[in-house]
Regions:
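Reductase modules of NAD(P)H-dependent flavoproteins
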Residues: 132, 137-227
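Ferredoxin-reductase
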Residues: 1-84, 136-137, 162-164
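Conserved beta-strand elements of the Class I
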Residues: 103-107, 196
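Histidine-anchored nucleotide/phosphate-binding helix
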Residues: 113-124
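Short, conserved phosphate/pyrophosphate- and ester-handling motifs at nucleotide-, phospho-/glycolipid
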Residues: 28, 112, 200
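A short, basic/flexible loop-to-alpha-helix module at the beginning of a structural domain
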Residues: 89-101
Length: 227
């Protein structure tokens, strides 16, 4: 464990240095993390949890973000310290964003923004990408420094919503993220877009149903379902 950053309200970013030259995964995939001892010769993997990988491939470290929601993540909050050695295994999952000429709409609720960063940090010259990112409080905005850098890119379009935000002159809208908000922002591009959903299960279900009701085909809606 090389770095632990707290965002408050039980939300943490962890950076783990890996003992190999680089990690191999595709943007959108996840890893398993265990707090318990593991013997690679036994073939038995202990209790673990899965987390989206929030760092770029081919780095000597991996980054994850988690929020304290149950007993296991509470253990993580209590037991993880810089310098501690833990076991992870990767990569897993098929929530892989496909490059297309049509608009890509990445919808994130809370820590659900994590799997998008390896994709967003890849160099590109064309193809519009819209990140619709909703959080409850302003201090829950993750990767704010990276967002500021991306805002200078012509292909990147940020739509940031803070549920309990104010109407101050800040770079976000106050309110809850919704499909109607996305449709209003995209206009005629809404029907052309591919949608990626990542966040709390209730949010994902609501967005999927709302997109379907507006005529978006299932093949154009991609869901991060490991949660």
């Amino acid at each position: 464990m090389s770095k632990i950053q707290s965002f408050g309200s039980g939300v943490y970013e962890l950076e783990l240095t890996v003992p190999v030259r680089s990690t191999k995964f595709q943007p959108g995939q996840f890893l398993h993390l265990t707090l318990d001892d593991f013997d690679p010769t036994s073939g038995w993997w202990p209790e673990s949890r899965v987390f989206s990988i929030a760092s770029e491939p081919k780095q000597t470290f991996v980054t994850i973000v988690y929020s304290v929601k149950g007993n296991y993540t509470k253990r993580m909050e209590d037991e993880l310290v810089v310098g501690k050695k833990i076991w992870i295994k990767l990569p897993y999952g098929d929530f892989v964003i496909q490059e297309k000429d049509t608009p890509l709409v990445l919808v994130a609720g809370g820590t659900g923004v994590s799997p998008y960063w390896p994709f967003l940090l890849k160099p590109r010259e064309t193809g519009a990408v819209h990140l619709f990112y909703g959080v409850r409080e302003e201090n829950h905005i993750l990767f704010f420094d990276k967002i500021q850098i991306l805002k200078s890119q012509k292909w990147f379009h940020l739509h940031l919503m803070v549920e309990n935000g104010s109407v101050k002159d800040l770079p976000y809208k106050a309110g809850r993220l919704s499909v109607s908000e996305i449709k209003n922002e995209l206009g005629e591009k809404f029907d052309l877009a591919d949608f990626y959903l990542s966040g709390p299960p209730v949010m994902i279900k609501t967005f999927k149903n709302d997109l379907t009701s507006l005529g978006i085909m299932d093949s154009k809606v991609h869901i991060d379902e490991w949660e």
